[in-house]
């Protein structure tokens, strides 16, 4: 009997959401994504000890550079066990500074280049702020492809598509968390607000022939994944990938091109900020996500600083 994982792979590219290359080798995804929180967890894995030590060599006390070198080193290890691409994230503390995002993205690409890894195997992850989206628009024109993350609203998705970014990562589980806490409801199936958000974005992109890839992210359970079967890509934690592999039930495709979607929405900065302000969930979860990534970035830098 075919597993749900194999059925899912027939119409969705499966991506591993982890920095643990041993787990990635075990679940065999096409691509992989990392973020500051996952890199912090990876730093505690004994197999990464030498990568941490190597990252601080010749950094001249620049802990930010050491952090970027560690992220790239982890990316290199992951690329040895996947056929596709690695997403490496720009420091979340730069999320509201377009020029700083550009500089850090260029440095990450330069580090990968020095390591012999081509641009065609890397996506630069950037928070979906107005400044981040504008930076991504410039990077795309330079031939550096991007993954816009911490995406919680339709306004963010519309702005990303308009900017021509390569890929977006709309979050499912964190949206579910917010509504469950706010309303006390334990949403299931197609009633899940996170599932509804990604479904709306997917249909909008396909109806308007946007080429931007939709990669659902942040899953709390198998039901959320199953409800988005057919999405371009889904980035899933290794434990949920293994649960899909162990389940031999039938998996029905839920998303496919051809469904009705809303007309194109082109937003200027003022309109983007107003729509974002009107969406309490998206405003709160974006701010919370940036703060959490920033705190974990600081913890990672503290580990590296101790080795400088």
Swiss-Prot record:
The keyword Transferase applies. The active site is at 125 (schiff-base intermediate with substrate). Its main location: cytoplasm. The keyword DNA repair does not apply. Signal peptide: none annotated. SUPFAM superfamilies: Aldolase. It is found in: Cytoplasm. Its EC number is 2.2.1.2. It holds the Pfam family TAL_FSA. It catalyses: D-sedoheptulose 7-phosphate + D-glyceraldehyde 3-phosphate = D-erythrose 4-phosphate + beta-D-fructose 6-phosphate. Pathway: Carbohydrate degradation; pentose phosphate pathway; D-glyceraldehyde 3-phosphate and beta-D-fructose 6-phosphate from D-ribose 5-phosphate and D-xylulose 5-phosphate (non-oxidative stage): step 2/3. PROSITE patterns: TRANSALDOLASE_1, TRANSALDOLASE_2. GO terms for molecular function: transaldolase activity. GO terms for biological process: carbohydrate metabolic process; pentose-phosphate shunt. GO terms for cellular component: cytosol. Keywords: Cytoplasm, Pentose shunt, Schiff base, Transferase. Belongs to the transaldolase family. Type 1 subfamily. Homodimer. Transaldolase is important for the balance of metabolites in the pentose-phosphate pathway. This is Transaldolase. The lineage of its organism: Bacteria, Pseudomonadati, Pseudomonadota, Gammaproteobacteria, Pseudomonadales.
